[in-house]
């Protein structure tokens, strides 16, 4: 097997490696739902490598247009990688907890997926982070924000309410917001609830969400917030999920800057 590999040319080895990455990505895409975004990126990278192979093939045959296209593709990739680096840096820098002791006027917990009536892994981590924070801040109102999507028997807000009440949080503090279907709506409708409660949204509020999601939530809120990050467990698989989510969030941040939502 090793002799056959050595007998291959560099171009043949690259094609073989690209085919291997393609197959591995297809397996991840099919059998590991949590890593689908990273698998899609790998598939895209494989496609780009194949395009490079074709352009190089035609460029060596004297097609000048292929050579120019190859240079243009390199320039686009360098620009895209530079933009990704900037966005990813923002996501990472915005993922840390707020260390200030300044009091907050309210807490907003952002929802995530619900499987039937059971919180997803991401939502469980947000509930855990919220429960710990509310124990330390027992006198502030809490808005639980999240509507109902496909496959969800109850709203995300109701799922969070049930879980927090089971953990001993006073139900009278909890104000479900059950209309939202996006982060932007989460914050818009939560702001309206705070105003109804007589809480000035311009005052400092705490926002509980996943660590990778904090940067975008902070930008969308626009005011002074106490960031309360929810983290996935430290096991290797969950850390792979974390990397996947942080990479995906850079694209979500790009969409926010382009579309404003």
Region annotations inferred by a language model:
Residues 66-89:
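Internal/C-terminal transmembrane anchor helices
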Residues 1-7:
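Short, Lys/Arg-rich, polar N-terminal cytosolic tail immediately upstream
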Residues 239-261:
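A transmembrane-helix-recognition feature enriched in membrane-embedded lipid enzymes
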Residues 26-30, 80-88, 257, 261:
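Short hydrophobic alpha-helical membrane-anchoring segments
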Residues 11-58:
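Membrane-embedded alpha-helical segments of integral membrane proteins
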Residues 63-64, 211:
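Alpha-helix N-cap/helix-start capping motif
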Residues 3, 56-63:
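Cytoplasmic membrane-interface regions of multi-pass membrane proteins
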Residues 85-247:
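A structural signal for short, hydrophobic/glycine-enriched beta-strand patches
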């Amino acid at each position: 097997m090793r002799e056959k590999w050595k007998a291959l040319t560099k171009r043949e080895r690259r094609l073989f490696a690209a085919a291997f990455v393609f197959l591995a990505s297809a397996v991840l895409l099919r059998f590991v739902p949590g890593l689908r975004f990273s698998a899609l990126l790998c598939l895209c990278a494989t496609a780009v490598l194949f395009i490079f192979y074709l352009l190089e093939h035609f460029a060596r045959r004297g097609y000048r247009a292929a050579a120019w296209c190859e240079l243009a593709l390199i320039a686009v990739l360098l620009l895209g990688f530079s933009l990704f680096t900037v966005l990813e840096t923002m996501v990472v820098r915005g993922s840390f907890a707020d260390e200030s002791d300044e009091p907050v006027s309210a807490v907003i917990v952002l929802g995530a997926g619900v499987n039937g009536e059971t919180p997803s892994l991401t939502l469980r981590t947000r509930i855990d982070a919220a429960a710990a924070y509310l124990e330390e801040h027992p006198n502030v109102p809490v808005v639980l924000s999240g509507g109902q999507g496909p496959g969800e028997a109850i709203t995300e807000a109701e799922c969070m309410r049930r879980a927090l009440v089971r953990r001993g949080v006073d139900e009278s503090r909890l104000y479900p917001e059950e209309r939202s279907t996006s982060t932007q709506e989460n914050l818009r409708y939560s702001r309206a609830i705070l105003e109804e409660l007589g809480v000035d949204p311009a005052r400092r509020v705490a926002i509980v969400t996943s660590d990778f999601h904090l940067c975008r939530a902070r930008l969308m809120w626009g005011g002074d917030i106490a960031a309360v990050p929810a983290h996935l467990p430290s096991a290797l698989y969950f850390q792979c999920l974390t990397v996947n989510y942080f990479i995906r969030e850079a694209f979500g941040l790009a969409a926010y800057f382009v579309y404003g939502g």
